[in-house]
């Protein structure tokens, strides 16, 4: 594995498991120091301990991204400790669940909860860390979803919001030399996908893929490492699908 991130710092939200942990493992393998957050403190501690046992340098913070004061407190602490931050991966999000497809049962409280974590938190964190990212001419990666292109009431709409926000961030942050892109994963074999999709839905969506492969969190992490690296120095304001061609057919 190349060491494209030697001497660099990567901030990864939702890093206790799934795609967040895969990002952490990939960036650590390529030499990055890690700053990890999650709302699940015990799971985050286990993940950080396992990463350190593999040789990674990482610090872990419990942050509830639904709460603006916690986001700002975390960002202020990082900015005070680190003059430069090279990568911010806005990976944390609330997954599908019942309200993703049950329009009639979607309450204002539930909608605002999805919106705050999936769309507002990435904006607040990027805003608050803009100075150290600018000093490093860093990269922001937003993790959206193939669901942003299909009818998925709460989850899909908030991820579509994050797609649009990616364009807005790229437009503003480009003046600072900060690249902003998003990854839109398709169906991935992660605990969240298995827990939130009925088996028949999982099988149907997987069957729509143009490539008959099992997508994994490592596939998304590999794409993220490319987009955050100097190999992608001329790429910004893009939403890159990682879905085996599923977007072409639509997730029904």
Annotate each predicted stretch with a short phrase.
Residues 2, 95, 100, 236-252:
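Short C-terminal tail/terminal secondary-structure segment
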Residues 3-35:
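Canonical Rossmann dinucleotide-binding motif of NAD(H)/NADP(H)-dependent dehydrogenases/reductases
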Residues 99-103, 107-112, 205:
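Substrate-binding pocket helix/loop in short-chain dehydrogenase/reductase
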Residues 126, 158-161, 166:
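Active-site helix of classical SDR
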Residues 131, 171-175, 233:
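Alpha-helical segment proximal to the catalytic Tyr-Lys
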Residues 137, 174, 179, 235-237:
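Short, small/polar-rich loop/turn modules that mediate ligand/substrate recognition or access, typified
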Residues 182, 203-235, 240-244:
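C-terminal helical subdomain
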């Amino acid at each position: 594995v190349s060491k494209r991130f030697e001497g660099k710092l990567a901030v990864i939200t939702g890093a206790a498991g799934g795609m967040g942990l895969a990002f952490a493992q990939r960036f650590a393998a390529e030499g990055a120091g890690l700053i990890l957050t999650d709302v699940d403190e015990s799971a985050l501690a286990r993940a950080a301990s396992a990463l350190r046992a593999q040789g990674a340098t990482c610090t872990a913070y419990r942050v509830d991204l639904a709460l603006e004061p916690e986001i700002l407190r975390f960002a202020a602490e990082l900015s005070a400790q680190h003059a430069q931050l090279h990568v911010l991966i806005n990976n944390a999000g609330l997954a599908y669940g019942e309200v993703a497809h049950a329009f009639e049962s979607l309450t204002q409280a539930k909608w605002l909860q999805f919106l705050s974590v999936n769309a507002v938190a990435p904006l607040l964190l990027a805003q608050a860390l803009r100075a150290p990212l600018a000093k490093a001419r860093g990269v922001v990666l937003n993790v959206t979803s193939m669901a942003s292109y299909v009818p998925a009431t709460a989850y899909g709409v908030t991820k579509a919001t994050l797609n649009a926000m990616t364009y807005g961030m790229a437009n503003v942050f480009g003046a600072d030399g900060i690249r902003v892109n998003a990854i839109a994963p398709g169906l991935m074999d992660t605990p969240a996908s298995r827990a939130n999709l009925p088996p028949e839905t999982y099988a149907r969506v997987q069957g729509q893929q143009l490539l008959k492969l099992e997508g994994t969190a490592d596939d998304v992490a590999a794409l993220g490492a490319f987009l955050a690296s100097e190999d992608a120095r001329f790429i910004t304001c893009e939403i890159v699908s990682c879905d085996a061609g599923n977007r072409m057919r639509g997730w029904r």
